[in-house]
Amino acid sequence: MCHTSCSSGCQPACCAPSPCQPACCVPSSCQASCCVPVGCQSSVCVPVSFKPAVCLPVSCQSSVCVPMSFKSAVCVPVSCQSSVCVPVSCRPIVCAAPSCQSSLCVPVSCRPVVYAAPSCQSSGCCQPSCTSVLCRPISYSISSCC
């Protein structure tokens, strides 16, 4: 059964599969509706060129558009001001400044997640206590991480 009770300006929402309750209504600028899993507060509309749509867990304030070259969507921690595409191989999820040339993988032992300076060329740990973000090369031992 499709949900069509959308406010003006929205396209008809999609049919909600059993794990999704309810389906969401998306702005007319979006090509397709998206379905919101039970554990999500809200969903996000992504441009036609991006696949798939990203789901926003309760702890996330914003989401990220994942290019077709990436295999899975990622969630941006609350402390991040902007989002970034992170390769599937990166664990855990990290955030990086929009000016970064490439994604940054931060070792699992690093806490908390912080912004990566655009000058960072390889994986490393960034110290949140510094007034200006510092990127530590991967050559540093894991024990020296945040």
Curated annotation (Swiss-Prot):
InterPro entries: KRTAP_PMG. Pfam families: PMG (PF05287). Keywords: Keratin, Repeat. Sequence repeats lie at residues 10-14, 15-19, 20-24, 25-29, 34-38, 40-44, 45-49, 55-59, 60-64, 65-69, 70-74, 75-79, 80-84, 85-89, 90-94, 95-99, 100-104, 105-109, 110-114, 120-124, 125-129, 130-134, 135-139. Restricted to a narrow region of the hair fiber cuticle, lying approximately 20 cell layers above the apex of the dermal papilla of the hair root; not detected in any other tissues. One of its GO terms (cellular component) is intermediate filament. Residues 10-139 are annotated as: 23 X 5 AA approximate repeats. Belongs to the KRTAP type 12 family. Interacts with hair keratins. In the hair cortex, hair keratin intermediate filaments are embedded in an interfilamentous matrix, consisting of hair keratin-associated proteins (KRTAP), which are essential for the formation of a rigid and resistant hair shaft through their extensive disulfide bond cross-linking with abundant cysteine residues of hair keratins. The matrix proteins include the high-sulfur and high-glycine-tyrosine keratins. This is Keratin-associated protein 12-2. It comes from Homo sapiens (Human). The gene is KRTAP12-2.
